[in-house]
Amino acid sequence: LHVRDLNLHRVQAPPGSISGAASEARAVLRLLREASQQNIACPKRVRIELPLPLVDLDPDVFAFAGLHGQASDWSGGLGQRFRVTKGLIDDYVLDGYENEYLGLLDRDADGMGVWRVGGGSEGEGGHDCTVVTHPADTTAGFFLKLLDGEYGKAVTKSNHLIVVVNAFWSGSGEKVGQPWEFGLREQAKQVLSVKDGGWEKVYCARRCRSASGVEGTLCRKWPEPWRLFNTEGVRVVLETNDEPSNRQIAEALNSDANVGDAAGYNRKGVDTSRDDDVIT
C-alpha cells in the first residue's frame, strides 16, 4: 500500500468532471500518436475507459456509476449511451485533431462508432489512428473483421494505433459470439486477449466505492502507473503497475478512511453490529 500527499510528490489530482477526464484522455492519445509516429516503443492496440454521466445528475458530474464505472441506467439502451460517448469523443478526446467520423461499423453493430484520426492520402500513409467505441461480446465479430483489414487496410500497418473506447468484451474474448461459433471464439481469444500487455488500458478515470461506503477515484494515464485517490482526491492511497482488483481498491479505501469491511465482504455477519455495518 502506498500513501502519499499530492503536494509532496507533484502527482496530478484526478479529474473533477467528465469533460475533464475526456480532456485527459486526449492528452494520452497525443502522447501515443507522437510515440508511434517516431517509432518509439509504445502499445498500438489500446483501451480508454471514459466515465459517463448518471441520468439523474448534471451531465458533467463525475460520480460513482457502479461496477467498473459503467453501470449507468440508460433507458434508451446502447443507442443513448453511444450518443453520450460520441459527444465526449467529438468535443474533447479528438478536439483539435484532424479526424472524420465514419459512422457505425455495421448496421447490426450497436454502439460501435468508428473515427479515422490523422490526414494524408493512402499513398502518404493515410490516417495513423482508428478509434472504435463499445465493441462487445455480441459485436466482436465486426471488430475482428476491422482488425483483419476488411473495412480498410490502414489498420493492419504495424505503426497504426487502434483505440477502443469503453470496451465490453468479457475477459480475453472467451465469450465472444455464440457457444457454437468455435472458430470465432478461438480467433477472439488470440486477438482480444488482455494478458501480457494486450489491449492495455492507457487511460482510466473511475469513481469507486467500497462495500463500506468509502469512495475514491481510480486513475491511469499512460505511461504512468495506476493510482487510487482518496475521497477528496488529495491523497494517493494505492499505486500499482497493473489495474488493481475490486478487492484491492476496497481494502485501500477502507484502510485510508480507517473503517472496516462491511458484513458479507470478508467477515461473518455475527461478528459485526447491524447498526454500524450495512451491506451495500
Predicted features by range, described:
Residues 173-258:
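A conserved mid-domain beta-alpha-beta active-site/ligand-binding segment of alpha/beta enzyme cores
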Residues 1-143, 149-158:
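Positively charged, amphipathic N-terminal segments that serve as targeting/anchoring signals
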Residues 45-49, 129-133, 161-164, 217-218, ...:
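Ordered hydrophobic segments in well-structured contexts
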Residues 248-280:
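C-terminal structured domains
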Residues 137-138, 147, 154-194:
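Ser/Thr/Gly-rich flexible loops in soluble cytosolic domains mediating phosphotransfer, phosphorylation
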